[in-house]
């Protein structure tokens, strides 16, 4: 069971999609905006691992890598009963707009309260959120 | 169903309630079931009954537990509604990350600007 309404975030970047795209898939560049990456294999089925804050590690797998337009990866927190690996997906679409790029990020599958009572897999999310909020 | 949506405690209260691993464990125990305090306490070897009572109060104040009287017993169960507020906190994570992405890309790709 997944959330019917995903989280969506967008931003405009003053650079073309070809300049933005590597930041979505390459470990040293992912580290610049999400968290320290300990590895990234940017191809369908390839895995990545990120450290957010001191003790939250995120594991994911690339599902779609379509440079310089679109990337889709799974997003999970291993060893927690929330956001188990593969339970949610993040889709990032790059659209050129003149010299700029519009970035649209959509996080699908996040648990919601209506399903929390019935669904294992939400309390680890809370661990993550508590840390995000504590920053 | 209790408490109208407008009466929800703020996300800070919810997050503080969730900051304690024992309290998160309590929520796991009462997810989808109702338990009296004694049975909840039985799951914790290192926490006194008093300590559990205190945790239950914090969780109730945060709106994360609902309480029902059954005879002489009080039964507790998860009340998940405040989690929507917490989800809203995650909704702030990605925009913040994208702002960092923008800063990184634009720092590395300065506009060609004037000549050259």
Language-model regions, residue ranges each:
Chain B
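Amphipathic alpha-helical dimerization/coiled-coil segments
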Residues: 1-10, 28-32, 83-116
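N-terminal helix-turn-helix DNA-binding core of bacterial DNA-binding proteins
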Residues: 2, 12-48, 74-84
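Short hydrophobic/aromatic segments of transmembrane alpha-helices and their interfaces
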Residues: 7-9, 41, 66
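A cross-family signal for key residues in well-ordered alpha-helices
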Residues: 16, 28, 60, 66, ...
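Short, hydrophobic-biased segments on the C-terminal half of alpha helices
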Residues: 56-57
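Beta-hairpin "wing" of winged helix-turn-helix
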Residues: 60-71, 77
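Alpha-helical interaction segments
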Residues: 65-67, 82-85
């Amino acid at each position: 069971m997944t959330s019917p309404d995903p989280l969506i975030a967008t931003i405009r970047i003053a650079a073309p999609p070809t300049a933005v795209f590597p930041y979505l898939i390459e470990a040293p560049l992912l580290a610049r905006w999400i968290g320290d990456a300990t590895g990234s294999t940017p191809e369908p089925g390839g895995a990545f691992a990120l450290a957010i804050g001191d003790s939250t590690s995120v594991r994911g797998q690339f599902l779609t890598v379509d440079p310089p337009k679109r990337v889709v990866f799974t997003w999970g927190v291993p060893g927690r009963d929330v956001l188990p690996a593969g339970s949610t997906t993040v889709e990032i679409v790059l659209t050129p707009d003149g010299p700029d790029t519009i970035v649209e990020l959509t996080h699908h599958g996040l648990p919601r309260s209506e399903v929390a009572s019935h669904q294992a897999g939400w309390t680890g999310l809370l661990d993550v959120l508590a840390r995000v909020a504590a920053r | 169903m209790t408490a109208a949506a407008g009466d929800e405690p703020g996300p800070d209260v919810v997050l503080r309630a969730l900051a304690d691993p024992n309290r998160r464990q309590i929520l796991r125990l009462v997810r989808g079931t109702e338990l009296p305090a004694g049975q909840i306490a039985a799951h914790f070897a290192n926490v006194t009954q008093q300590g559990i009572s205190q945790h239950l109060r914090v969780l109730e104040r945060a709106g994360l537990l609902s309480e029902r009287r059954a005879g002489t017993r009080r039964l507790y169960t998860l009340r998940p509604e405040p989690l929507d507020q917490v989800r809203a906190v995650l909704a702030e994570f990605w925009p913040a990350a994208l702002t960092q992405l923008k800063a990184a890309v634009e720092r590395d790709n300065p506009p060609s600007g004037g000549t050259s």
